[in-house]
Regions:
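An acidic, low-aromatic, low-complexity terminal/linker signal
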Residues: 1-179
Length: 179
C-alpha cells in the first residue's frame, strides 16, 4: 500500500508540473472518444478493399497455385502455406481481369469459427497491398454498392474509397471448398 501511494503522489506531482500547477482532466475520460479500428488496405483489379487487421494473418508473395477443375471463376485454386492448404479467391473477378494477368500478393485472412463453421484460412488475391490505416466505426459509409454483397460499407483512404470486406459475407457469396 505505501508503495502505491508513493507512485500516486509522484504521478500527481508530475501532472501538476506539466499543466502549470492546475490539474487538467484527462481528455480520455472527459471526452467521449470512439474506438478506432485498424484496417489493411489492398487493391484488387481497379478497386480498393480493406478489412480489419485482426482478420489478417499475413501477406505473402504470389505462391504456386494449383487450379482445381470445374470450380467457379472466382476460385483461382489452392496453395500450400507451410503445410496448410489455403483456397485462393479473386474478389475482383467481376471486373474482367484478363486471364493472363496474375496478382502479385495474397492477403491471408483468418475467419474465426462461429457455431456452424470451423476456423478457416482464406487467401485473397491482391495486385497491391497498400498498407494499414485507422478509422472509427462512425467513418464507415453505409452506402456499399448493391452489386458487391460481400462489403458492409466504404471508408475513405487517401482521397479514395475502399470497400470494407465482411469475411463472413464473402464466404457466403463466394463459397469455397473446405479442405
Amino acid at each position: 500500500m505505501p508503495l502505491e501511494r508513493e507512485v500516486e503522489r509522484e504521478n500527481t506531482a508530475l501532472s501538476a508540473e506539466l499543466d502549470g500547477g492546475a490539474f487538467l482532466e484527462s481528455e480520455v475520460f472527459s471526452e467521449e472518444r470512439l474506438p478506432e479500428r485498424q484496417y489493411c488496405v489492398f487493391r484488387a483489379g481497379r478497386e480498393r478493399f480493406c478489412f480489419s487487421v485482426l482478420e489478417v494473418e499475413e501477406v505473402v508473395d504470389w505462391p504456386i497455385v494449383t487450379r482445381i477443375p470445374l470450380t467457379p471463376a472466382f476460385l483461382m485454386g489452392v496453395f500450400n502455406l507451410r503445410g496448410t492448404i489455403v483456397p485462393l479467391i479473386d474478389i475482383a473477378f467481376t471486373e474482367g481481369r484478363r486471364p493472363g494477368l496474375l496478382p502479385k500478393h495474397v492477403v491471408v485472412a483468418l475467419l474465426k469459427a462461429d457455431a456452424h463453421r470451423e476456423d478457416m484460412r482464406l487467401g485473397i488475391a491482391a495486385d497491391e497491398v497498400i498498407g494499414t490505416f485507422s478509422a472509427t466505426e462512425e467513418a464507415l459509409l453505409d452506402q456499399a454498392p448493391a452489386d458487391v454483397p460481400h462489403c458492409r460499407g466504404m471508408l475513405r483512404h487517401d482521397d479514395r474509397l475502399a470497400l470494407v470486406v465482411d469475411l463472413r459475407r464473402l464466404v457466403d457469396v463466394f463459397p469455397v471448398p473446405v479442405i
